[in-house]
Regions:
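ATP-dependent carboxylate/acyl-activation modules
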Residues: 6-7, 144, 148-155
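A conserved ligand/cofactor-binding region detector
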Residues: 10
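Helical "substrate-binding/catalytic lid" subdomain
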Residues: 21-149
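Phosphate/pyrophosphate-binding betaalpha-module
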Residues: 1-6, 14-17
Length: 155
């Protein structure tokens, strides 16, 4: 099976992590990191939207993704989402998801590993079901862009 996976993977895009379960564990941690990174993007762009300036958030996302220390594929995807809907008015801030984040936080607690950023980002996903915030819209929009995750359309 490994030769088949290696033959279809992009260069350096395949990793055998160890015995049964190790790959799922690594993916769980990956998703936890993703939760925190998305939450940080959402909070930062909500700050930009709340500023007393008329800021072009699409241009900011594009600029930050061009050599800035926080450049990332997620920031590129946010720029794409903002390009078509600069205020993200077509969707709600209900982020959805939460299953792998919960697994990550529960596992961290069992191991005694502090993961406050990831835990708080999980709680903010639950909060997004109650409150429609721009930060939640940012997270939902980027999740739609990279994973085709469903978003709730604004009424």
């Amino acid at each position: 099976m490994i030769p088949l996976l290696e033959s279809v993977a992009r260069p350096d895009g395949y990793l055998h992590c160890g015995p049964s379960g190790a790959g799922h564990y690594v993916k769980m941690v990956h998703n936890g990191i993703e939760y925190a990174m998305l939450q940080a993007l959402g909070e930062g762009f909500e700050m930009l939207r709340s500023a007393p300036y008329d800021l072009d958030m699409t241009a900011i996302a594009r600029d930050w993704n061009n050599g800035c220390v926080i450049r990332s594929w997620m920031l590129e995807l946010l720029g794409d989402a903002l390009e078509g809907d600069p205020r993200l008015d077509t969707l709600t801030g209900d982020v959805g998801g939460g299953e792998t984040g919960r697994w990550m936080v529960e596992t961290a607690m069992e191991l005694g590993v502090p993961t406050p950023s990831i835990a708080l980002s999980l709680l903010m996903r639950f909060r997004s079901r109650q409150d429609d915030t721009f930060a939640g819209r940012v997270v939902a929009a980027v999740r739609r862009e990279f994973g085709g995750h469903a978003v709730k359309e604004a009424e």
